[in-house]
Amino acid sequence: MTEVNHRCAVLGKPIAHSLSPVLHNAAYHALHLDDWSYDKHEVGEPDLEGFLESLDPTWSGLSLTMPLKKMIQPYGTPCNTWAKELMVANTAVFDWTKTCVNGNSNIPFIRLYNTDVRGIELAFEHSYQTRAITPKTDRSGTAVIIGNGNTATSALAACVEMSAIGHVIVVARHPEKNADLKPLAERYMPSEQPISIVGMDHAIEALRQADVAINTIPGLAADGIAESLRMPGVRMHGTLLDVVYDPRPTKLMQAWRQQGGIAIGGEQMLLYQAMVQVWLMTGIWDDDPPSGMVDQDCTARLEQAMR
């Protein structure tokens, strides 16, 4: 048996449902990284510092779920655009030659990255490439984000990065929540009216305009929208990413396809954000990788692992 010299894991509470070990270990196999191993550990907010202090230099990195994506901030240095801007990091990479920025000598220096945003972008790029679709580049397109929680913030950041999108409509049950969305869009999206935030009663009207749509509300919460999409005369022309990956496909994805649109599941976002994490933790890449860096063999193995 090969000795494990490099350890990584995903942290969260609960964490039993996580697919990250399946994805990361499949990537290690594809990349012939035989002495790398990835696991999962149930770690809550009060346990984070103690867990970090318990690690040894065989540890290379961590994946983090909410609320640890925010809790990790005092222990590390944000190193890519959206980790800095959003102050949310789902990826921690250790440097054992230095100590923690907060002065704790029992914790190594930690570089923090946000790969959620890039994962969303790459999921759309992959969908376009496999269907030979050339997206717009003139910021004339419209994106619709369903929900306005933490995932919606990452979705908005991904829309900012898409050269096709000039206007984002956020559809939410409580439009007044998440005051960070409007200033984020206004700061980064070079258009006269970068964002509108409306109630759920405007969902179908908004989705009819969507070149890109991203559902960020969890569980079965979007099933009502799915039923409304099936009404006579409703047609979709854009591409939907539903971040929910269980069940697959969701009712929203099924309805979207029935009404003429393209729908991709949340497992694609999960796959690509995990792939970028692997590159960062293993040192293959040290920033947000360009589209050309996507390893097709690695992608195929990860897709197979998720079946």
Predicted segments, located by residue:
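Glycine-rich adenosine-cofactor-binding loop
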Residues: 12, 108, 114-117, 124-161, ...
